[in-house]
Amino acid sequence: MAGVTLRDYQEDAVKRMKMGCILNGGVGSGKSRTAIAYYYTQYGGKVNVPNYVRMVNPPDLYIITTAHKRDLLEWEGELANFYMSTDPKVNIYKNKIVVDSWNNIKKYAGVKNSFFIFDEQRLVGYGAWVHSFFKIAAQNKWILLSATPGDTWSDYMAVFIANGFFRNKTDFQKKHVVFNPYTKFPSVLKYLVAQF
């Protein structure tokens, strides 16, 4: 079997990535392949070598993406490059691989000891998706992908909390947000830069 090939910048990204990171890249930059390559190398696979190197005991893989990407089977094409599939008859590893949409994230809140790729990061705010994400992040390994990075610190609040930098939303806001005292509703006046 032929080996998996990455572009130089993708291989560099895989080497720099850590669990709980956000992989930012433009549309069409190869974030999906890079994310799968990160998962693949974490469990013994090797990229940019002539022959395919199998993973060793990979955990189940869950990919949470947009309904559009799920329905177009975009992730299936990328998985095939690594001899993986959501079809158990074709997947050489026999681990569970699921591609589903953000609308169904709550279904996976009880999953443990797996690896999650969250595509098109949708963790802005503090709603139901974020609460399900916290449950998943606490019991699994995970990374996020985004082509549209957030504009403010609070856009990343869920990621900071999931990585253990803050206990909760209140802890984050005490350290980084100044609210306007002259409005009847919570309105952000400014964000504070972290002091180390």
PLM feature segments, named:
Residues 1-24:
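Conserved pre-motif I regulatory segment
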Residues 23, 63, 100, 116, ...:
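Hydrophobic positions in the central parallel beta-sheet of the AAA+
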Residues 27, 32-43, 47-80, 150-155:
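Conserved Walker A/P-loop ATP-binding site and its immediately adjacent core
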Residues 59-60, 115, 132-196:
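Conserved P-loop NTPase motor "coupling/switch" region that bridges the ATPase
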Residues 66, 78-113:
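Inter-Walker segment of RecA-like/P-loop motor cores
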Residues 68-71, 104-105, 123, 148-152, ...:
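Conserved nucleotide-binding/hydrolysis micro-motifs of P-loop NTPases
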Residues 119-121:
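Walker B catalytic acidic pair
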Residues 125-127:
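Conserved D-loop-proximal element of ABC-family nucleotide-binding domains
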